[in-house]
Each structure stands twice: as C-alpha cells, then as structure tokens.
Amino acid sequence: MSLTADEYKQQGNAAFTAKDYDKAIELFTKAIEVSETPNHVLYSNRSACYTSLKKFSDALNDANECVKINPSWSKGYNRLGAAHLGLGDLDEAESNYKKALELDASNKAAKEGLDQVHRTQQARQAQPDLGLTQLFADPNLIENLKKNPKTSEMMKDPQLVAKLIGYKQNPQAIGQDLFTDPRLMTIMATLMGVDLNMDDINQSNSMPKEPETSKSTEQKKDAEPQSDSTTSKENSSKAPQKEESKESEPMEVDEDDSKIEADKEKAEGNKFYKARQFDEAIEHYNKAWELHKDITYLNNRAAAEYEKGEYETAISTLNDAVEQGREMRADYKVISKSFARIGNAYHKLGDLKKTIEYYQKSLTEHRTADILTKLRNAEKELKKAEAEAYVNPEKAEEARLEGKEYFTKSDWPNAVKAYTEMIKRAPEDARGYSNRAAALAKLMSFPEAIADCNKAIEKDPNFVRAYIRKATAQIAVKEYASALETLDAARTKDAEVNNGSSAREIDQLYYKASQQRFQPGTSNETPEETYQRAMKDPEVAAIMQDPVMQSILQQAQQNPAALQEHMKNPEVFKKIQTLIAAGIIRTGR
C-alpha cells in the first residue's frame, strides 16, 4: 500500500535527523511524486539533503523549484543561498540571503549564512592567491612533507621535489600542474590540513550550522579544524579553510514542518479523547511527541491515561513532561499544568499529602484560582481524614477521666489539655466541649467557654448542662439579656428531657442575671438616672419604642387595673417584668 506525501515526508525527516541523507532524498522524492499539489517544503527538504551531501548543483535545482512554488517563503531563499555558497558563487549567495531577511528579519539561518558569505569574501580579498605564497614560502616545506606519512613516499621523487621548490618563486604555476599530477592535490591538502578521505574538497564552501539538538559528539569532533605540526599549516590557518568546521544544512523540521504535523496529530488525538477513545488518543499524542518535542503532547497523553484510570502511568508521563520541559525551558504555565495534573492523579489515588505537594508546586510555577481552590479543598480533606483517623472512643474516655481528675485538683490548664484530647478522640461527644468550657471558665476564658458550649449544644441540643454553663459564662461577661435567653431555653429543655430536675439551678441563675442586669450604680440613683441607665439596654429600649407597649403604659398610668388585664398575655407579661426589673415601672413598697 502506497504511503501519503505526509507519511513519506515524516520518514524523510527521521532519515535526515539520523544523517542518512541518501535515504532522506529517496523518501522526499517519493513524497514529491505522490503529492497532489507542488509542495515547496518537500523541495526545500530535499535541497537540504543535497547540500549536506555537497551536491550543490542538485541542491540549487531544488531550491529554485522551492521559491518558484512559494516565492514569499523566506527559507526557500536560505536554500538558494546555501547552494550558491557551496558552488562558490558568493554574490548570488549574498543576494539570496538578503532576500530571505527582507521577507523575515528574524530568519536566523539567513543571518548566519550572510555572515559566512562576508567572512569568505574578506578572506578572498586578503589572500587573492588563496594563500599559496605562504604555503610554499615555508623553509621547512620539504622536510615537513618527508616526515608526513601521506607524502613521505612522494618526496623520494627528485622531479616532484624540484617542482615544489619552484613554486616558492611562482605559486600560481601549481594551477596548471594540478591537472597533470594528482600527487599535487594530496600535497596541497596536506599543507592546508584537509583530509581528502573524510570530506569533499568543496567543504570550504559549507553551510550554516545545524541545530545543537541534531548534532552527535562524533560530528562535532569531525567539524573541528584538523591539527598538524607543520609550520605551513599554521601559516595557512587564516585562509578560508576555517569555514570547513561548518556542518550540514538544517532542514525545515521545526515550526514550519514538524510542529504543523505534530499539531495535526494532536488534533486527531483530541477528537478521540472527546469521544472517550483514549487508546487511540494516546497513539496520536505519541506520534505528535515523536514529530515535535512539545510537552503539551505529553500533558495530553497523561490526560487520556488519567481518564482510563491509569493514574500511576499518568504520573510517570507527567513527571517526564516536567523533566523534558525543564531541559527545553518550556513555558512555566505548561509545567504548572503538568504539576497540577500530577496532583489530580494523586488525589484519585487517595494520597492527599502528595496531592497537596504537587498543587503547591503548580502554584509556584503559575498561580491560578482553580488550583488554589483545589489546594485548599485538599488541605481540608487531609485535616478531616487525619482527625477521623485519630478518633478512638476508648482513648477519649481515658482523656475524660484524666481531665476530671485535673479539674478536681483545680489544675485547670491540664484539665483543658485533657478535655481537648477527649474532643479529638471523640469529636461528636458533647461532653468534651462542655467539660472544657467549665475548665476554661475557671481560667476566666469566658468567650472560649461560650464557644465550647455552643459546640456542645450543636452536638446535643438536649444537653441541659451545656446551656447552664453557657449562661454562667454570659453573666460573667455581662451579657445578661443573652444569658436570660439561654436560661429560657435551658428551662424548656430541662422540662422536656429531665422533668425539671435542674429547674432550681436555672431559676437561681435567672434571678442573678435579672438582678445584675439592671443593678443601679449607686444607692441614691434618681428615677431619671434609672431611666437613662435602663434605656442603654437594647431590650428595654426596644420595649419602650414598641407602639403597643407605649399604649399599654399610657393606660396603666390612668387605670393601673388595666395593666393586670394586659399581663394575662405571656408576651406582655415578659416585657412588663423586664421593665419592672429595669426600674422603669416601680411597684408599691
């Protein structure tokens, strides 16, 4: 079954990356043949392969075809510039690199290519005889050639030695002899430090460097200038051979090619993901990652693994995404998303500590409201889980008895600690809160005692002792009206649950609260002073401002017997009693 142009192109990209340029040319040729429409990128890629093989004429033909198909694509002119540079046509190379920069000022390869053209032009101007004068002016020339294993046998020919000595006077003469005596080519290469077995002689017209990610250690070594002990080589080191350190031409396998292809695979993966066909989605995300190293594809793959319930696999994928992202200096927002998804996976696994750890890492990279909310919820879950794991009724009873012992000894601080332990061990037992409230009250911590009583009442609304302790604390902080309300509730609950067994204690507290509520500041207080003091009480002020009560009080002034009739109403009775306690209504003495 024949492959598509895109499939051939992907295989060609892989072959190019592996430095198998002949194979890459074959695959790009097939891609060109099956492509429904002329594709400038395919010609550009094949041109890059030819350039890497130093087949500059073929590279030039493909580059011309590339710009013919798409004359507005700046990288096509990179290809033309590279081919012309390889052929030694510096003017055309310069012209095409400049054209590339006109179309795209950020074209890095064009800038590097143009710089190389300028360096080569300067070298030619500095040494119009290509450095031959310096090469043959070396007084140790013959001796060095005799010592070199590549040329030692040649130096046994006296006629050849005589020729070399003659070139000292006339170095241009070698141009005629090169075509008739191939030994001279070897000698020239040796003097210039060129290994004819390794590189084509045209390598001096080389291409811009390939991206670091596509270089191997061996290629870097091969690209370095060859070392030699001969003085003649040192003298010629300033010649254009310096440019031989350049490597093969980069191909368009990044944003304009591999990224586009990878995004297509990602889009296909997204379709399968939405259809909940996660295995197929993962397959496409893997292809996207193979085509272009963007950790977004790994994040997507992890999302599919997560939906499959393969949480540990997803965590492994996301850790790889973070590691790769660090190396590639990926956007911190993308890395933040990787950390967040690791947190999600750990949450599914029930590891709340790891969940919190990775949500925090995510927020360190990039703070978002969503992850912050998840972090807060996870922290609450962990706190709740730890509290639930701590529950132990037997330990709670031990703590209660310990607290009781401390309370009996008047060791209030340790009593509070013991009852706190009881609450942790049995958070639903109202007695722990009520007992701690009693100890806190002894320490004069009345607001905290009231809070504990409220918690005890919340846990057990029929716990009369909690109401009584709450009212006692409220009286201590002079919240008399609130204390009376609490005691009313206590009286009701006591009657319902305990048959009024605590009625006497409740009545005593009620009387105490009522008396202290409106207790005069001095024994010689005038009625006006009593009225002003009483009106500071919110309940008294509300009663006096009630239109119904105002009417009743006016009637009572004219007919005291009418007041007795109104007091048959429980609500009115309560309000009248409050006004009597406040000193607003004075009874006979």
From Swiss-Prot:
One of its GO terms (molecular function) is mRNA binding. Residues 138-177, 537-576 form the STI1 domain. The keyword Ubl conjugation applies. TPR repeats lie at residues 5-38, 40-73, 74-107, 262-295, 297-328, 336-369, 396-429, 430-463, 465-492. GO terms for cellular component: cytoplasm. Part of a larger complex that includes HSP70, HSP90, and immunophilins. PANTHER family: STRESS-INDUCED-PHOSPHOPROTEIN 1 (PTHR22904:SF523), TPR REPEAT CONTAINING PROTEIN (PTHR22904). This is Heat shock protein STI1.
